[in-house]
Regions:
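Conserved short submotifs of the Hanks-type protein kinase catalytic core
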Residues: 98-114, 118
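Short beta-strand micro-motifs within the conserved protein kinase catalytic domain, predominantly
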Residues: 87-103
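AlphaC helix of the eukaryotic protein kinase fold
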Residues: 54-79
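C-terminal lobe helix-coil module of Hanks-type protein kinase domains
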Residues: 192-299
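Protein kinase catalytic-loop region centered on the HRD/HxD motif
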Residues: 136-148
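Protein kinase glycine-rich loop
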Residues: 18-25, 29
Length: 354
């Protein structure tokens, strides 16, 4: 494993990298301070750095796919700006202290963790789960209207503000963009992914055509499937492992004993059918059915009805991070030539000047 040397460094002359928040298979996530931010709300940011060497080997084809993955995420985030979708604040290429070239994206910092962390403590009350689900549906509806299918909706990709009042969709790295060429083919997270875009799952029952045909014809129903599996986790407090690659057909106790359980289960079961055509086709339809199914249980808990419409016009009464970003430029390919065209990080001196 070869990690980037970025801690206590300044990236692009403005981002002071303070901490590593985590590492995935091919990316490193850092918290940084933006010295160029005029607004204090934008001062703390997240740097997502692509590192093709994290697995300890190099593969030219994989490298091209990962770079395209990164490019795809930046393009998608520019296209789908919305209060419930993470904001891209910048992007670029740089070289770390060891001379390793890498691509990076600058994202807004939320600070409230993700829904998987929240649900790990205990299942959410139904009205609280619906509060978050309405926001997620609004963000996904806007993405779909903009020609973007996320493909990897799961609790870990749903981030929360510090006060846990706003949820935002993150990680558009495997999103399918309408009319885009060279679609990313990385598998979505299996337990939440719709069968039509997961080549590890036998999907012959989906359609007489090939699995590849199913992958190239992704529709919003794929995200609806994943969101329904996510809703199960939120409501039940456990991942839907018993229904991996299958429709949700029951809720565990004690949720199954709740008066709302049969009607909510019917919605989740329809949304997770193997055949895309048998699911809800629009995010608005899924939300309408789900909120109606839960209405008897939530009516005593909600003083005034929540707004039902979840279109891209949804407005939230909160200060939202929606900074404008420059037009997306295609990332340069990683090569030895990068050293002449991208910035180098510099070490930040400590208090004694070292």
């Amino acid at each position: 494993m070869t990690e980037l040397k970025l801690l206590q460094c300044r990236l692009d002359g403005r981002y002071d990298i303070e901490d590593c928040l985590g590492r995935g298979s091919y990316a490193e996530i850092y918290m940084a301070r933006d010295r160029g931010a005029a607004d204090e709300r934008f001062r703390k940011v997240v740097i997502k750095a692509l590192n093709v060497l994290l697995q300890g080997y190099q593969d030219a084809d994989l490298e091209r796919t990962l770079i395209q993955n990164f490019q795809n995420e930046a393009i998608a985030l520019d296209r789908v700006r919305h209060p419930n979708i993470i904001s891209r604040l910048g992007h670029g290429t740089a070289i770390d202290l060891t001379g390793t070239a890498f691509h990076y994206i600058v994202l807004e910092y939320l600070g409230g963790g993700d829904l998987s962390m929240l649900c790990r403590k205990e299942a959410l009350k139904l009205d609280r789960a619906l509060f978050f689900l309405q926001q997620i549906c609004a963000g996904l509806a806007h993405a779909h209207e903009s020609g973007v299918i996320h493909r990897d909706i799961k609790p870990q990709n749903l981030l929360l503000t510090t006060n846990h009042e706003i949820v935002k969709i993150a990680d558009f790295g495997v999103a399918k963009i309408e009319a885009a060429e060279g679609a990313i083919t990385r598998v979505g997270t299996n337990i939440y992914a719709a069968p039509e875009h997961n080549p590890l799952v036998q999907t012959a029952a989906l359609d007489p055509n090939s699995r590849q045909s199913a992958q190239t014809q992704l529709t919003p129903a794929a995200d609806i499937y994943s969101l329904a599996k996510t809703a199960y986790t939120m409501i039940c407090g456990v991942p839907p492992r018993a229904f991996a690659h299958h429709a949700i057909t029951e809720l565990p106790a004690p949720m199954s004993l709740e008066p709302w359980a049969p009607s909510v289960l019917r919605v989740l079961e329809r949304a997770t059918q193997a055949r895309p055509g048998e699911r809800y086709q629009r995010m608005q339809d899924f939300w309408d059915e789900l909120s109606d199914a839960a209405l008897p249980a939530t009516r005593p808990l909600i003083a005034t009805p929540a707004p039902r419409h979840i279109s891209s016009d949804l407005k939230l009464e909160a200060d939202l991070v929606t900074a404008a970003a420059p037009p997306m430029n295609v990332f340069a390919k990683l090569s030895s030539k990068l050293s002449t065209s991208c910035s180098r990080v510099i070490r930040i001196p400590n208090s004694n000047g070292r």
